[in-house]
UniProtKB/Swiss-Prot annotation:
EC number: 1.17.99.6
Binding-site positions, [4Fe-4S] cluster 2: C208, C224, C251, C254
Cofactor(s) required, per the database record: cob(II)alamin; [4Fe-4S] cluster
Source species taxonomy: Bacteria, Pseudomonadati, Pseudomonadota, Gammaproteobacteria, Enterobacterales
Official protein name in the record: Epoxyqueuosine reductase
Catalytic activity reported: epoxyqueuosine(34) in tRNA + AH2 = queuosine(34) in tRNA + A + H2O
InterPro entries per record: 4Fe4S_Fe-S-bd, 4Fe4S_Fe_S_CS, QueG, QueG_DUF1730
Gene: queG
Source species of the chain: Salmonella typhimurium (strain LT2 / SGSC1412 / ATCC 700720)
Assembly behavior: Monomer.
Length: 384
């Protein structure tokens, strides 16, 4: 396939192969190419918005169908280069953290440096490399920060298929990877989607602590622990607080139970290595952080975006779910009066602690968490 730019003939098939090789050299584990036609995804997106499954993420409704129209983000766009990069660290310690209610569980994608800047920088370099090769090119990189349907694009580009938890799954890598896109104005040959591999499996749906996967491929964000601990700005609904357990930032349960994640690959990026203060952290220590400490520890981290107040809110809920101890109650009492939002969650947590003390309750793991820990420890999922 030949194409001319400024009278310079280009072999687009060869260029596509070059782009994939350049992407690998830049640290991406896979590179695919697709067109911009996402019309098939528009009805499901509209239905999801109509049901208010986006919760308080008003920007999703505000952008509406623009998410399914990449060419509106960069006029002249003909193709989308979709990439993925592994983020699973070598010492993820899923099971040991989840089963110890005195520790805080942080979704493993957030243990290291914020991925947005890293991936965007690599995508920009890829765009510049293509631009240099072609002599002229319009491009724009995206990393989970603009109104674009990155998962349908990744699926069309052959990076994997959409699992019933709505994440992209890959036969050789599971789902522990980030996605990114580079919009360009070249008519490159496109890749083909891969065959779906979930079959009748519904493990992700049944393991979800809050029942957020309301039907295959559909997540009600309002019930999702990741939404509740990251996106939700106000009070966490009381019904969900006991189900959150010790998860203080995000949740990985639907990924951890997935059989395909036995093939998950470790990251090569040092920036994604866990920060010491966030790896198997003690809840009481986390709750003692001042705002200055929080900002220092989370500098350059995705966690920083929720702010100190919501961080304390999340940790307060986890302390309410922890085994009874005088130390927990003392810690909770010590932060009363700092903010009405925090006070609400502190009062709830103290009530939970007192109930456990009065009933002499020893911490009992919820059945779903017990099952998940057993699955991880048996090695069905890599407990890196």
């Amino acid at each position: 396939m030949l194409w001319s730019i400024m009278s310079k003939p280009l072999d687009l098939n060869q260029l596509a192969q070059n782009i994939k090789q350049w992407g690998l050299e830049l640290g991406f584990q896979q590179v695919g190419i697709t067109d911009t036609d996402l019309r098939a995804s528009e009805p499901a997106l509209q239905a999801w918005l109509d049901k208010q499954y986006h919760g308080e993420m008003a920007w999703m409704a505000r952008h509406g169908m623009m998410r399914a129209r990449p060419h509106e983000l960069l006029p002249g766009t003909l193709r989308v280069i979709s990439v993925r990069m592994n983020y699973l660290p070598a010492n993820a310690a899923f099971a040991s953290t989840l089963k110890d209610p005195t520790l805080g569980y942080v979704s493993r994608y957030a243990l290291g440096r914020d991925y947005h800047k890293l991936l965007r920088s690599r995508l920009k370099k890829l765009g510049e490399q293509i631009q240099q090769y072609c002599g002229s090119l319009n491009f724009r990189p995206f990393v989970d920060s603009a109104p674009i349907l990155e998962r349908p694009l990744a699926e069309k580009a052959g990076l994997g298929w959409t699992g019933k938890h709505s994440l992209i799954l890959n036969r050789e890598a599971g789902s522990f990877f980030f996605l990114g896109e580079l919009l360009i104005d070249l008519p490159l040959p496109v890749d083909q989607p891969v065959e779906e591999g979930c079959g009748k499996c519904v493990a992700c749906m049944t393991i979800c602590p809050t029942g957020a996967i309301v039907e295959p491929y559909t997540v009600d964000a309002r019930r999702c622990i990741s939404y509740l601990t990251i996106e939700l700005e106000g009070a966490i609904p009381e019904a969900f607080r006991p189900l959150i357990g010790n998860r203080i930032y995000g949740c990985d349960d639907c990924q951890l139970i997935c059989p395909w994640n036995r093939y998950s690959q470790l990251t090569d990026e040092a920036d994604f290595s866990p920060r010491k203060a966030l790896h198997n952290p003690d809840l009481l220590e986390l709750f003692s952080w001042s705002e200055a400490q929080f900002l220092k520890v989370t500098e350059g981290s995705a966690i920083r975006r929720i702010g100190h107040l919501r961080w304390l809110r999340n940790v307060a809920v986890a302390l309410g779910n922890a085994p009874w101890s005088n130390a927990v109650i003392t810690a909770l009492e010590s932060r009363k009066g700092e903010h009405p939002l925090l006070d609400e969650h502190i009062e709830w947590a103290i009530a939970q602690q007192i109930e456990k003390r009065n009933a002499c309750i020893i911490e009992v793991q919820l059945p779903k968490k017990q099952r998940l820990v057993r699955v991880i420890e048996k090695g069905l999922v890599r407990d890196a």
